[in-house]
Amino acid sequence: QMCDKLGIMSQNNRVDIGVRFECHAEIWAPITDMIYEAKIIYRSPKTRCLCRTFCMNPNGSVVAENTNGIITVNGHSYKDPKFHTQNTNFALLVTHRFTEPFKDSNAYGEYIANLTNMLSGGVMVQRFGDLIDNRRTNRKRLNESFVHPTLSAAEPGNLALALPKQTLDTIIEMIYALDKA
């Protein structure tokens, strides 16, 4: 509104939607030991969307955050070794750019976050294998998992019920690409 008032052209019709990915720290140690926060960008040949890593936390924890009643996640990493975990976490964000007539990309992102909250009662967690098998993660499989999530309050669920297919397909492609790197 301020830009309109001042006659300044502006454009804000993009939103980043994604997940916080958590895995054993030793997997990323060859990178995070050299570069604390690696910035990796992937363009999906299938969806043509960009996906990027963001806010990498070696030996860190996933935490819940409440923003205007919407529960989302963030990651923290601490210098003090007594707060270190066995996991590294980072966001995988897919950028979506919208065209006319759609104008409210922020509301779209909030809608997806609200939908995830509705399905899980807060933060949702899903094992990658369950995501690929198109099945909801349950507490039993999560407890038997190779990676133990640092946010124990996260509710097992199925991200495919909350995230748009294009977003999820791009994230899955990037995870496979990272695995080959």
Where are each of the predicted segments found?
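Residues forming the flavin
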Residues: 1-181
